[in-house]
């Protein structure tokens, strides 16, 4: 897929939403006679993609991650999430994949989508089970979903990996307090 533009890869994956989002950010290609969203999708369906190039994959992945980071800083969490999704298409290493998943989890969390944030955080923990940040992301998503007991477990797992992590310790205290309050409301 590398050696192709992100918009071509999105078209090849059948992601019209991603093509529409990338369209205003992509310079027109002289190889496409119909520079439109439908034209790009049609071209890729008919001609396919160019062979992969690892260096180009790394470059495109880095560009998408940078755009995602910028979108996140601007509060454009959906755009950031979609850019991280695009970066996943460009052969990240296992560690880079975990980082992208952690960042996409935070983006979807800030966007208010707890289920998607939890899904990414869970995959992140599978990819890097000894990474405290993965535990933190999972706990944060569980907090948004009001699954406080499980959030406590995730934060505690992270503290086992990094006992001096103040963010995890604070998050665990907040989760324990939320769990306690939830139990008292049930009575």
Question: Language-model segments: which ranges?
Answer:
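Alpha-helical linker/edge segments of TPR/alpha-solenoid repeat scaffolds
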Residues: 16-20, 28, 32, 46-58, ...
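Helix-start (N-cap) detector for alpha-helical repeat units in TPR-like alpha-solenoids
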Residues: 61, 95-98, 132-133, 166
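Structural marker of alpha-solenoid helical repeat scaffolds
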Residues: 90-93, 127, 161
